[in-house]
Each structure stands twice: as structure tokens, then as C-alpha cells.
């Protein structure tokens, strides 16, 4: 998005312009600002962004409406089965992304039947614990807080990462080429993140969940386990706003990591594409 000027006689006329790609075409939209750039240009820019995303927001709202309609029709027993299935798939994928050796079927055996495969005990315990934290998370309708995030982390890792479980780091960390913020800044960074998460009327919840996930991973508040907590946080926001959740699949981990290593806007575009690819298909089925 950029501000440009055009000459009209001796006068300059200012416009706010945005170009984006749609398929193979480049679409350009613009609005007239006046003979000078208004003082409230930031507000105008945000309103312009929202107007450009009108179709997107309508589609996301349709996904939410269809999901809620279907969910309300389901008997409680069917809902519980569905949540257990989501728990299995989500737990398998989120742990596999972080290097777990547990397969999808082994995750099912652990979660449903309490049967432990011949795999590292750490992976078995983290599968069991993550599933329980996820299902308990869905029962919570409260605001996001440091206490909540620390509890999730502690409950998942208190038997496998005892020295760091349930605590924010107090030492520097590096993830590949990325150097996380100084640990002394974590308190303030997390306060800003949590305040944004809980702010009312804070734009579309699907976009918010992506932004919060991205910023959480950049803060990297824990010594380890940030990806799993970040993906729980992402789905907590979606679920409590009435939207279907999103599973970042292990098979798509490369594009996911690539998006996380980019800037926030690029990650948001990636996230929205994935969300619409998964839930947009279900949206189309309801029309047929």
C-alpha cells in the first residue's frame, strides 16, 4: 500500500493505492485523499484495508456460520467423538512438527486406548499430555493470561522437560539464524501480546489468531515447546470466537516454517490461504 501524487494543472492530488495478485492478474485499487495527505492517514489506511478485505471477511463469517449450525445440530456424544478425533490429529501433527516419532495410529492408541507403543517414553508422555491439555483447553472460556500459558506448558512438559516446564526462559535462545528477543524483555512483550489477544472488537478472529501465533513464536518465551504452545494459543482464539480450528499438518511443515521465517504480513497471507483451503472446501460442500 502506498501514497502517490498526480499533477492536475498546478495542483497535486494524493491517492492511497494498493495492488495485489489474484490468480494470474494484478488488481489495483485506490482512493482519493485530497490535495494534501490527511493527518488521520493511518486511520484511513486501516479502513481502506478493511474495505479491500470485505469479501474475505464475508467468506470467513460464512465458514463460522456453517460450522456453528452444524455443531449445534450434533448430539453431545457426537461432539465428544469429533473433539477426540481433532485431538488425535492435532496432537499427532503438532508433535511431529517438533520431531516426535509417534505416528498418527500410535497417537490414536495412546489417546483412545491407553496403549503405549515401543517408542521413546518422552514422545509417548508428550502425546498423552498434549491431548489432555488440548481437550481441557476447549472447556475454558476465559481470557488469555500468563498463568494459562504457563499451565499449558507445565502440564505438557513437567515429566519430559522438568528443568524448563511451566516457566518463561531467563537465558538467550537462537532458532537457526533467528535470535529471539532478550529474556529480560519477555515480560513486557508477553503483556503486549496478551493485551492484544484479549482486546474486544479486535478485527477478525481468524486474522487475530494468525497474528498472535506469529508474534508468540517471534517472542519465543519458553526454552522449548514454543511451537506447540503457539499452536494451542492459535486454536484457543479460533475456538472461543466460534470458528473451526486449524491443524497445521506435518506434511506441510516446510511451507509453515518458511512462512514463520518471513514477515508478519506474509505469514498472515499463508495462514489465511491454509484456513480457506481447509474450511473453504467444507463451505462449498454445504452449498451442494
Functional labels for PLM-detected ranges:
Residues 1-224, 228-288:
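FIC/Doc superfamily catalytic core
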